[in-house]
């Protein structure tokens, strides 16, 4: 992902990237073609979808599918307090078995996402705590770069910034950074061979 967003990882400069994918969130401090510290957790976009699904089961006794859960996350999901929006959600009533539609607020969805968002922020903090001081100074100046589909969750950059006191930037094309980086490595195997070892 770091290569795909254009970071020159060969320099003696500390960069930190947070890749919030579907199944995992990977955080790495990179310098001189190597990973200095890293943290991987199995909490990412899929877990967020599951938390929304469980929220509807527990709070509203409504069965929704994972596709609906992901759609809700994309449309009104957020990591922080935002302008509240109401949305209609269709599902199957767990008590009667009959289809029904309910109105929910984006604030409820934020509550449903609280645990996975907190887990991601805590993993970022752990990675920062393990970073050598000379690279920490670079990171404080350059900021944290967030990539992957999970970086599109509204407010995820703001909450990481607030809780770490480090600037945060979302990658320009966060969904394609890993694919683009893989392509660049394959086109320049000699240049990136140290990264592959």
Name the predicted role of every residue range.
Residues 8, 112-139, 185-189:
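Phosphate/ATP-binding catalytic cores across multiple sugar-kinase/actin-like superfamilies
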Residues 10, 17-24, 30-34, 44-46, ...:
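A short acidic Gly-Thr/Ser loop motif
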Residues 34-36, 137-142, 164-167:
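Short, surface-exposed connector motifs at secondary-structure boundaries
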């Amino acid at each position: 992902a770091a290569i795909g967003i254009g970071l020159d990882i060969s320099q003696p400069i500390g960069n930190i990237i947070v890749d919030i994918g579907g199944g995992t969130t990977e955080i790495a401090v990179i310098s001189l073609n190597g990973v200095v510290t890293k943290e991987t957790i199995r909490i990412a976009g899929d877990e967020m979808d599951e938390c929304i699904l469980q929220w509807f089961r527990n709070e509203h006794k409504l069965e929704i599918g994972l596709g609906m859960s992901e759609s809700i996350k994309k449309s009104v999901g957020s990591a922080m307090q935002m302008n509240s929006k109401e949305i209609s959600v269709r599902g199957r009533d767990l008590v009667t078995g009959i289809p029904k539609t309910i109105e929910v607020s984006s604030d409820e969805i934020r509550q449903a996402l609280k645990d996975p968002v907190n887990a991601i922020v805590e993993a970022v903090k752990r990675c920062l705590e393990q970073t050598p001081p000379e690279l920490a100074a670079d990171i404080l100046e350059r900021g944290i770069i967030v990539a992957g589909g999970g970086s599109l969750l509204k407010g995820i950059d703001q909450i990481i910034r607030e809780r770490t006191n480090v600037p945060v930037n979302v990658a320009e094309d966060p969904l394609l950074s890993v694919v683009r980086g893989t392509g660049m490595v394959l086109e320049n195997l000699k240049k990136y061979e140290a990264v592959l070892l």
